[in-house]
């Protein structure tokens, strides 16, 4: 997986766009069975790789998108979609347990059972490791990540309307860490690398699109950035209520999931968000004056 994604969590970011699209085609009644079999195989392989990443972002994105899709489809027409939703959820759960067994198998290759009992990880431990650690400030990389978010937020609060300026905010970040935060190993590494390589080569971004835009452009810049997305989400919800169309549900969830990516990384990681935004505007404006 690292040969494709240098950061395993990016697998979850790309899932934000791909999973709603796969669900849309799996739910399409007009597709022939061979096409659905190939698509179902691809879906199974993709979520198998998500589970193999052992990345919190990938797990959280998959769980969140799946819950949104299930809720959206059942509210749209639960009688029509109940059986296939249960089938897809069952397949996903089965693949999760298969991935746990596969991880145990890979981890124990080369370990002699005569010398030492091979370590095993349970499904509960996998869930706790990758989802239970999301909120804890002292869990895994959360300490440095939260410190970075707080530093950018403090910076933004000094100039809440207009911010510090695009690209300038990354240069000032190290000055907004508190003393205790500078003792974090991750923060120490960032500051050390910036001192060594310089600001241009090693800027310290916020790992959060929205906090970074707030620190750079203030509330005015952040509001201007979010307005097109807010408008299109409102129009898609309006279309779903009016036309009860599965396509709009999948598109709405894809846009929401892609926006969630910005809460844990830069939106430039998933350029597909801009394609989704353009597609959404084409769908909404293409309805004509009668909507």
Q: What feature does the model see in each segment?
A:
Residues 58-62, 265-277:
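Loop-to-transmembrane alpha-helix initiation sites
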Residues 29-33, 81, 85, 237-252, ...:
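A juxtamembrane structural motif centered on a specific transmembrane helix
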Residues 73-137, 153-158, 166, 180-181:
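A membrane-periplasm/extracellular boundary helix in multi-pass inner-membrane enzymes
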Residues 2, 136-150, 154, 158, ...:
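Long extracytoplasmic/lumenal interhelical loops at the membrane interface
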Residues 37-46, 200, 204-208, 215-217, ...:
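Loop-to-helix entry and N-terminal half of a specific, functionally important transmembrane alpha helix
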Residues 14, 57, 165-167, 220-223:
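Gly/Ser/Thr-rich beta-alpha loop segments that engage phosphate groups in nucleotides
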């Amino acid at each position: 997986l690292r040969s494709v994604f240098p950061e395993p969590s990016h697998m979850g970011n790309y899932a934000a766009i791909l999973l709603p699209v796969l669900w849309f085609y799996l739910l399409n009644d007009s597709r022939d069975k061979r096409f659905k079999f190939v698509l179902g195989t691809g879906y199974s392989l993709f979520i198998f790789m998500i589970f193999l990443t052992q990345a919190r972002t990938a797990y959280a994105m998959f769980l969140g998108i799946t819950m949104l899709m299930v809720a959206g489809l059942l509210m749209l027409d639960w009688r029509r979609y109940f059986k296939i939703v249960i089938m897809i959820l069952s397949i996903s759960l089965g693949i999760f347990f298969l991935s746990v067994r596969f991880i145990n198998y890979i981890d124990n290759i080369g370990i002699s059972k005569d010398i030492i009992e091979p370590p095993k990880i349970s499904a509960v431990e996998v869930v706790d490791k990758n989802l239970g650690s999301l909120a804890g400030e002292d869990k895994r990389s959360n300490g440095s990540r939260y410190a970075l978010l707080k530093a950018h937020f403090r910076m933004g609060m000094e100039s809440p309307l207009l911010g510090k300026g695009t690209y300038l905010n990354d240069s000032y970040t190290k000055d907004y860490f508190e003393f205790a935060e500078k003792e974090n190993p991750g923060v120490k590494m960032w500051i050390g690398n910036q001192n060594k390589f310089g600001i241009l080569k090693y800027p310290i971004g916020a790992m959060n699109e929205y906090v970074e835009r707030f620190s750079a452009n203030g509330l005015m810049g952040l509001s201007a950035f979010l307005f097109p997305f807010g408008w299109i989400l409102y129009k898609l919800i309006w279309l779903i209520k009016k036309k009860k169309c599965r396509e709009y549900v999948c598109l709405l969830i894809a846009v929401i999931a892609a926006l969630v990516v910005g809460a844990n990384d830069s939106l430039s990681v998933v350029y597909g968000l801009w394609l989704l935004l353009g597609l959404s505007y084409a769908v909404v404006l293409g309805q004509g004056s009668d909507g």
